Amino acid sequence: MKPIYSSVLVMLAACSVPLDGRAAATFVDARTYPTQAAGWERFLAVEARLVRGFDDICGDTFCEGDYHNLQALRFRCSVEAASGRVEECVWTFTGSIAQVDPAQGHIVVDARTWACRAPLAPDTPLSVLLQTLEQGEALHAWLPGTSTSLYDGLMGCL
């Protein structure tokens, strides 16, 4: 009885591995959830709304300091593949200062990047997050299950 039992366990384990030999991913990029066809356009449209919102307010807020040319790069979220719950979202930015060295004539550049984590509530479903960010002013919308916005998260980051 024991040899059959262990053979069954080996067969079950083999069946749980994808055919290409890789283990199934626990987390996936939100752009490809639930499938690339279903997630890609929707997520990129939300990202474009966020970038427009940032560009609209940058001159009066974040872009008043040393890094007056801040640019939003990418907004990315990781999603638990089995449940659709967001694990984390990060929005990346870049900015620079360029000055002339008066003694040497060289251009001195201080270029930086920032990775700003979104202040999400635990276990936020991706579908609810995207629906929230598709409405009105995405940058100022309260994130699901919180009383904070992406703008609030940027205040502590940039």
For every predicted segment, state its role.
Residues 10-11, 21:
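Cleavable N-terminal signal peptides
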Residues 21-88:
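N-terminal secretory signal peptides
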